[in-house]
Amino acid sequence: MNAIDSHLMVRDPAEPLARLRAQWGGRSDLWVFGYASLIWRPEFDAAEHRPALVHGWHRALRMRSRVNRGTPQQPGLVFALMPGGACRGVVYRMRRERADEELERLWAREMPTGVYDPRFLPCRTPDGVVPALAFTLSRRSDAYMGRLPDEQLLHILRHAHGRFGSTLDYMCHTAHALRQHGVRDREVERMMGLAARHGLIGQEPAARTAARSSTVSTSTSTPGSSTSAAHAG
């Protein structure tokens, strides 16, 4: 997800690739779990894809991007798979005979800086559980931004733009792709509503509903948005 960037170079990405190949063994098809841009821009040939649920991890827009969706002067944000909760996404199956070649391409895209902690996670699908490669992020990583106040998030959505486009476009693409796959991520929807209310995108249906409700009664409190534990990865 990030291009080579000395600010984020934390380890040689060849080492986790060798470890993952040893775990996979090359004796079967390879599954990959998509939770953000891999859903709407996978860039590899998949023999099959399925909706999937991962427990123990959640999607969060908390990974710093200084190249693809931002700059060193104005870092952007991209989604990461963080510990805790649960996550709905899509698993893709690479055919064994092509998986090694496709894995090289995927690694060049996702792991040029070695910032992720790639691992196999059990993914529940309608046809059973499959072990799938997922790109996770540690809270100890220098790329981890933590939970940002809405004011800071809005500033990033307004101004962060990198070689592949803006953080705002990236978030919108992910939200729309999730909806197309029947996934409603409450935190993603909350951020989309926030962007809509501040005029950054066309107003979302949820944002319009919230706006109407707030004009009807000011005495009824609206429950706060929950964490992303009910959704996807």
Q: What do these predicted regions represent?
A:
Residues M1-G233:
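A glycine-rich, hydrophobic/aromatic-adjacent loop/helix-cap motif
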